[in-house]
Amino acid sequence: MTSTRLSPAFDRSRSVSRQRRNSRRPSERSTASPVDPRADSDNQEPPAIPEEISEIKRYEDFTTIDWVQDAVYEQSRRRAKRRSGSGFWDQEGIFGWRRKMYESYDAGQSWLVVTLVGMAIGLNSAVLNIITEWLSDIKLGHCTTAFYLNESFCCWGAENGCPEWKHWTSFWLFNYVFYFFGALLLSSIAAVLVKSFAPYAAGSGISEIKCIIAGFVMKGFLGAWTLLIKSIALPLAIASGLSVGKEGPSVHFAVCTGNVISRFFGKYKQNASKTREILTASAAAGVAVAFGSPIGGVLFSLEEMANYFPLKTLWRSYFCALVATSVLAAVNPFRTGQLVMFQVEYDRTWHFFEFIFFIGLGVFGGLYGAFVMKWNLRVAAFRKKYLSQWPITESVVLAGLTAILCYPNMFLKINMTAMMEILFRECEGGHDYDGLCQPQNRWSMVFSLAIATILRTGLVIISYGCKVPAGIFVPSMAVGASFGRMVGIMVQALYESFPQSAFFASCDPDVPCITPGTYAFLGAGAALSGIMHLTISITVIMFELTGALTYILPTMIVVGVTKAVGDRFGSGGIADRMIWFNGFPFLDNKEDHVFNVPVSHAMTTDPLSLPASDFPVREAEHLLNDNRFQGFPVVEDRTSKILVGYIGRTELRYAIDRARNQGMVAPNARCVFTKEAAEAAVARRASVSQHSRSSDTFDAIQRSAGASFVDFSRYVDDTPLTVHPRHPLETVMEIFKKMGPRVILVEHRGKLTGLVTVKDCLKYQFKVEAEEHTLAATSSPEFAALGGHLNNPVPETLEDRLWRLIQTVAGFVSGKVSGRPVRLRDRTVPRQSEPSGIPERRNDDAVVELEDREDRPMIP
């Protein structure tokens, strides 16, 4: 069955559902609620006020936004606004200019917000660059003329040495100790700030932002407090020497900036769709200021961050990135005209025989990405299981270990951006760093670069995900740059050994043939592409870093090979892997699923539903208090289960609270969810009270104190998305991706049979993958060696052995220092059969049950 045959079936399913519901209602009765923009203009019900809509649209923490209903509410808000100001909008003449001015302001409000956001992001990035460079250099020495200057500013214009910049002592060992304790101090301050004031400031934030833009609600993750702590702790974490970068956190604080500024404008405060546009544009600006690449930032936002990216969002993302980079260039934090330290320009060309080495760099990038992602997830699981109670200790120990390992290596002890600036350069023009370009030092440099590549890779694996602001872009680029420069030096040595070889026949004799700096540049692009699984945006970012069209083709080849190699080891970059690890309800547009099963295999059967009439209000309140369901299907009665609509948890809670505040709820009051049931209740009340039907309307009953029946029909969605139980699961997942509903109801001939959410789809996907892994494990030789029984004792894992080793070392060290060994207690989180604690019977994905939320490696 193909997708072209499924779409008409889905349309027929919805049309039949509408016809069935309409057939149950008299044609002269309007069923649209006042908050529904589908209501006719002559509807006699009072229009919904904007305050009511804003209350309904408040989403709870760890819930998903229903983009379909959000669009409905936004249209209703606009209609209510037009109705409330109808006299003002109709004015012309002397008052017409006021209307036109207001319309112009409302239309240009988005551009005002984007401009303010871009300016704030650019200014914040410039300040962070200046602070980071000074803190990184202060561990190595100080400026005797001005303590507040870093090494580059202190030595500005110096040609033969720099007497103004002094190391802390003249002894190498004392400088080593000072470097070590400086790293401990900076990392401890960063970890304490994050743990005490803003736990959400830890980590990179890109994976969470992807989920937030897709509609996942995480209150506080983009708040002002997170923005402040992230901006303060990020320079401290980078300057401590940890193998973490600022590019991922730059996206986080940029999106925080966009969220905070947009909240001052009512157009965005109550509109999730509008806010999504600003968040997407802010993410583009964050990448733009991090790499000095405005076009690359826009493409990164398109390729990686947003599931929904219309042309309007593209243009605003471009403008926001333009404003941010313009402000950064105006501040000019490095006083060189460069937006980032490692910008470089190449005036040489490449040769076709170098394609062999370029392909090798691409293979390295793919292998690096697969290796780091695999082992970083193992470290994340270990961190969650054993180290969640000691986030500060973990960060300090990592910083100390990094300082001990990195200081002896000339490429590891300096800042990673400064390292890439050195490795990217051509040797001509006086660009020499500690003999890097000297032929007699060639093989010692190769050895140092190899050590730097290996150590940096290991440090990236154990550092990314610790409880400080930590990105992985620049550390990966640093690994690729050191490996690429090493390859470039060896190729240069090969050429100098065999200059007359036919292999190098295309080289000109009067100019250098091999430029090792270009290999470092391409290696950095390969490693970045390997860890993120991106292609187009990485190519453009690397192009904007060099400004040379000459190296577009080599960059495309390297990135393409990296992508091909990386896909052999699994789909998705590090951000996608962390989303899966944390169990967030996120469906990636880049994934293609083939299950060949109907939606009934993944749906939640027998969901809790509400009868359309005669349902006690007290029972509804108990229902809300006793469970965390985020919505309820409404059926005619619980016996027939004929579907009539759907009401969300927020809507039901607001309706009950509003009725109680207005004194319309009696102790034995009952709620109705359809107009037919409401009118039937009015008729029964009228017959009992012996009033005329014409005078005793339902509105009058509602206005009387202690009404026996309360009408909630205005809060019910009477046309929810529905599918047939035999509808393909793949098509249902596409509906979630393209339309963004919170829940899709499953009905057969009008009868409710179940419901399906994003988490239902993910649960089924994980179940299928687990079965495939089990099948592969049972067919392996190791399984046969165990006797072919699944109930054998589970062998000790690598994480368990590593934890026992840490306990032994900690006990030995504490015993030598204090005389009494201290044993770290076990903190074992029970293994879950599923990636997130999803209850078996629930009504939607609304609440992600993140057990031990503090234990999450990136989301404390």
Where are these regions (language model features)?
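C-terminal accessory/binding modules appended to enzymatic or scaffolding proteins
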Residues: V716-D717, L721-R726, T731
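C-terminal interaction modules of eukaryotic adaptor/scaffold proteins
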Residues: E734-A785
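Short, surface-exposed tryptophan/glycine-enriched loops
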Residues: P607, H724-P725, F736
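Alpha-helical transmembrane segments and immediately membrane-proximal extracytoplasmic
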Residues: T2-T639, L643-R660, M664-Q702, S708-D717, ...
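Short beta-to-alpha loop/turn elements within the nucleotide-binding domains of ABC transporters
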Residues: I647, H727, V756
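A structural signal for short, well-ordered beta-strand elements
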Residues: S613, T722-P725, G754
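Acidic, serine/threonine/proline-rich low-complexity intrinsically disordered regions
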Residues: E782-I806
